């Protein structure tokens, strides 16, 4: 009995001794987190820190708030901020309405090729923004297809479609490009909707409008919030559409950054505008997170 007990104690001691080096050799979790954090800091945070630092560095050198005072006092900045906000809000509203209607049709109105259209929405998300703008220029540009058909049919020297070089052209291009970003989460939400609710509502005499308002819309609100917030942030930072439309007098914050940095070589002012743009984007994203958390989305 004593020999057996001694053997058991010896085995336990050997096991504990073998486990001790293994525990001592175990790498803490924070060590594994260092490489990705370092890569993230080097690739993203360091350039942002340089932009912020440059925004406080006037041409004379040193650190000062003068670049912010000069930019905030300029009419070009105020006009760019106003244009950016109203274009972003208008585009987001248009995308929400159009995206909701199109997603409803694709999800609940059976028609040939409906699944192919839903697949195309996924493909559309990968298109660059300038490609959509280029397509609109081919259709509605000064020498586009619509103006060509008009002049060919009427014999006029010029066509009537010249809105692409106005803010309305930018608005149309942004709605065209960003609407699928609203449709995608809506289609995912509609695919999980219990169709028996629609059947029960219809059997109780509810019309299509009431079914949409009472049954479908409440289920779609989280998806609408997600898609709308994404579109709003992307519209605030959109550069390619405004550049490719060549809209006269349409200067957004990203375009102002380009103008200050590339055309005027005023890097301090460009960094100030960039910091403002980043602050607006981060603020909107934080607000979206708070609202979605309270809504339970």
Show which residues each predicted segment covers.
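Glycine-rich helix-loop "coupling/hinge" segments at transmembrane-helix boundaries
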Residues: 57-61, 239-265
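A short amphipathic helical element positioned immediately N-terminal to and/or at the very start
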Residues: 63-72
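Membrane-water interface segments at the C-terminal ends of transmembrane alpha-helices
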Residues: 28-59, 75-191, 219, 223, ...
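Transmembrane alpha-helical segments of polytopic membrane transport and secretion proteins
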Residues: 1-34, 109-115, 287-297
């Amino acid at each position: 009995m004593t020999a057996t007990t001694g053997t058991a104690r010896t085995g336990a001691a050997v096991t504990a001794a073998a486990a001790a080096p293994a525990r001592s050799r175990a790498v803490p979790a924070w060590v594994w987190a260092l490489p990705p954090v370092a890569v993230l800091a080097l690739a993203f945070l360091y350039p942002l820190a340089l932009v912020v630092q440059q925004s406080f560095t006037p041409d004379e050198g040193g650190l000062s708030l003068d670049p912010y005072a000069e930019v905030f006092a300029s009419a070009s900045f105020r006009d760019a901020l106003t244009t950016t906000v109203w274009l972003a809000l208008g585009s987001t509203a248009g995308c929400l309405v159009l995206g909701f209607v199109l997603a409803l049709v694709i999800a609940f109105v059976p028609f040939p090729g409906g699944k192919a259209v839903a697949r195309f929405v996924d493909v559309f998300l990968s298109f660059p923004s300038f490609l959509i703008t280029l397509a609109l220029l081919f259709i509605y540009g000064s020498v586009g297809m619509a103006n060509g058909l008009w002049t060919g049919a009427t014999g006029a020297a010029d066509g009537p479609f010249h809105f692409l070089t106005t803010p309305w052209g930018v608005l149309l291009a942004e709605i065209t490009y960003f609407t699928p970003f609203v449709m995608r989460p809506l289609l995912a939400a509609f695919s999980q909707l219990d169709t028996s609710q629609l059947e029960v509502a219809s059997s109780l005499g509810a019309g299509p409008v009431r079914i949409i308002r009472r049954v479908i819309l409440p289920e779609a609100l989280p998806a609408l919030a997600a898609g709308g917030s994404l579109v709003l942030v992307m519209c605030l930072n959109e550069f390619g559409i405004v550049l490719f439309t060549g809209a006269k007098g349409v200067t957004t914050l990203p375009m102002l950054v380009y103008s200050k940095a590339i055309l005027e070589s005023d890097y301090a002012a460009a960094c100030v505008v960039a910091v403002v743009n980043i602050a607006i984007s981060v603020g909107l994203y934080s607000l979206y997170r708070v609202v979605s958390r309270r809504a339970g989305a």
